Amino acid sequence: MTTMTSPATLPPGPTAPRAVQGAYALTQPLRGMRRLKDRYGDAFTVNVPIFGNAVVISSPAEIKQLFTSGPELVDNLEVNLGRVLGPRSMFALSGDEHKRQRKLLVPPFHGRRLAAYEKIVEEETARELASWPENRAFATLPSMMRITLNAILRAVFGAEGAEFAELRELLPPFVTLGSRLAVLPISKKGRFSPWRRFERMRREYDAIVDRLIAKARAEEKDDVLSMMLQTRYDDGSGLSREEISDQLLTLLTAGHETTATTLAWAVERLRRHPALLAELEEGDGKLLDATILEVQRTRPVIDLTARQVKQDGFRLGRWTLPKGYAVLVSIALIHDDDTVFPHAATFDPHRFEGARPDLYQWIPFGGGTRRCIGAAFATMEMTVVLRTLLRDFTLVPTSEPGERWHSRGVAYAPAKGGRAVVRRRTTIGGAS
C-alpha cells in the first residue's frame, strides 16, 4: 500500500547559501526578521544553522494551528537547548514522555504553593534593593539576576547551605555559557571547544545536586526538590536521578535569566514613560499587571519558539510542509504587528487593562503543550519585584533614547543593563 502525500508548497524566502543566511541571522537577528517579513510577507522560508530548513510564521491563525496540532504532526525541535540542559530536560523530550514529565512538574508552580513562594521573592527583593545607590545611574540587570537566582534556589532547595552557596557561584557563568552554546553551531570536538568547559561545569553541578538529593531524602522538607523525590508516575515509579538533575537545571536556568531580563526591560521602559510611572506609584495593581504584559509584548526576551514537522504533507494555513522542516514562530514579529496590536510600536499598558491577552497572539512564554510551565511563577516574581521597587523607591525619569537590544545568547537584554537612577522613599526598616 502506498501512502499519498501532498507536494510541498513553501512560502517564499531568501535563496542565499545556509552560511550566508546564518551570518545574517546572527548579526541582524531582530532587524533581519522584520526585513524578511517586509519583503516576503508573514510567512517565509529560511535555511540557517541550528534549525536547518525552516518556515518562519507570525500570523495568529497559523500560530494557533501550530500550537494546537498534536505531537504526531509537529513536536519538539531538537536543537542545542536540549544538549545544554540535558537529555531528560523538558526542552529535550517529545510526545508522551514530555507529557508525562510535564504532568509531574506543573503542580509545584501553581496554586497555594505559588503564594508561599511570594514571601521568598519579597525577602530577596528587599535584601537586594537595600544596597541600591541613590542619585547615580547603575545597571539593574545584575541586581535582577541575583534576586531571581536566589528566589528560584530557595524555592527549589529550601533553606540556604553550603550547596546553595556553591550553586549561587556556579550557575551565573554556567547559564551564560550555556545560553551562548544553545544558539551557536559550535562543535564539541577539539581541545579548546567551549563545550569542554561547559561539560566540566555540568559535572560540578551534578555533584552538588547529588549531595542535595541525599540530604532531601534524609529530611522532611517542603521545597520543589522534595516534591520531585516524592512524586510518582501513573505506574508508581519515581523520577530517576538523571531526570531530577536535568529538570532542576531547566527550572534554575529558565526560571532565572529570562525573568531578570524582563525586569531590567521594565525599568528601562518605565523611566521613559513618566506619566505611566506616576500612575503606578499610586499603587494600582491592575495597571501594574497590564504593564508587565506590555513589557513582555514590546520587549520579548526570547524571539523564537519552534516545532519540527513529524509527518510529510503537514498543512499549515496556506502551506504544505515536508517532514523534517522546522516551524519557527517569531514572537517579536507578531507582537509588533499593527493588525494584531493597534499602534504596536507604542508602549501602552492600558491596552491590557480589563482584558486578558489572547494566548495565540501574546506569546512571550511560547504556547500549546510546550508553553513555559513556570509562566505563573515568573509573573508572580515580576509583580512582587516591581511592586516592592515602586513602593520603596522613586524611579527618576529620563529623556535618553531607549536602550538597544543586546543578545546574551538565548535572551535579548537592554544593552546598558536597564540603567536606573533612584531615590529611596523609606529607610531600610520601612519607617518614613
Protein language model regions, located:
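Cytochrome P450 catalytic-core helices
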Residues: 256-281, 376-391
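N-terminal membrane-proximal hinge/A-helix region immediately C-terminal to the signal-anchor transmembrane segment
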Residues: 2-94, 100, 115, 119-127, ...
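Conserved cytochrome P450 K-helix E-x-x-R motif and the immediately C-terminal K′/meander segment
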Residues: 22-41, 284-317, 338
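Cytochrome P450 heme-thiolate monooxygenase catalytic core
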Residues: 2-10, 74-82, 97, 113-261
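Cytochrome P450 proximal C-terminal region
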Residues: 6, 10, 37-38, 125, ...
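Cytochrome P450 fold signature focused on the C-terminal beta-domain
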Residues: 221-222, 227, 279-285, 298-318, ...
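Conserved cytochrome P450 K-helix/beta-meander segment immediately N-terminal to the heme-binding cysteine loop
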Residues: 72, 329-355
